[in-house]
Amino acid sequence: MKENSEGYRPNVAMVVINSTNKVLICRRKNTRTWQFPQGGIDNGEDIKKAMYRELSEEVGLSKDDVSLVGESEGTITYDIPKTIRSKVLGGKFKGQEQKWFLLKLKKDNSEIKLDNEAFPEFDKYEWVSFWQPLNRIVDFKREAYREALSELRFLI
C-alpha cells in the first residue's frame, strides 16, 4: 500500500479478541486516549507483514500468538481535525486510510507487553466488550471504528 494522492497515510488496524470475544484497547501514553493497535505501512511493505510488525511493536504479540480471523473488504479512512493535524504524524497527512484485521488470541494468557520499543505508544490496556471502544475513542475516529466493527462482527 502506498501513500495515495488524497493525502491519507496507509495504515493497518487490529481488533484483537480473546476467548470471550472481548476486544483489546490500549491507552496512548501521550494523549491518554484509547484506541485499537494500529500503525503505518512502510512504503512497499506487504499489508499483512505490516500488521504483524505493528502487533509486535505495539502490544508484544507475535504471529504465533494469534489467529487471523478475517479482514475488512476494503480500506476505511478518517480525517484528523485541522486544529491538531500539525501535531499528528508531523502534519504530513490529512488522515489515515486503514486496512482492518480481526485477530483472535490462541491463548488468553498470552502476555500483552506495551514496552517493546524505545518510545512505547501505550501505557495501559484493557479487555472490553466488542462495542465499548466506540464510547472511549477520540471523536474523529469514531465513524471509522463503527464501520470496521460493523463489518468485522460477522466474522466472530
What are the language-model segments listed below?
Residues 16-19, 28, 103-105:
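Active-site beta-strand termini and strand-to-loop segments that position acidic
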Residues 130-156:
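Charged phosphate-binding loop/patch that engages nucleotide di/tri-phosphates or the phosphate backbone
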Residues 41-139:
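Unchanged
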Residues 35-39:
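A short gly/proline-enriched turn/hairpin at secondary-structure junctions
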Residues 1-19, 90-91:
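Acidic, metal-coordinating catalytic segment for phosphate/diphosphate chemistry
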Residues 30-32, 95:
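A conserved beta-turn-beta hairpin within the catalytic core of GNAT-like acetyltransferases
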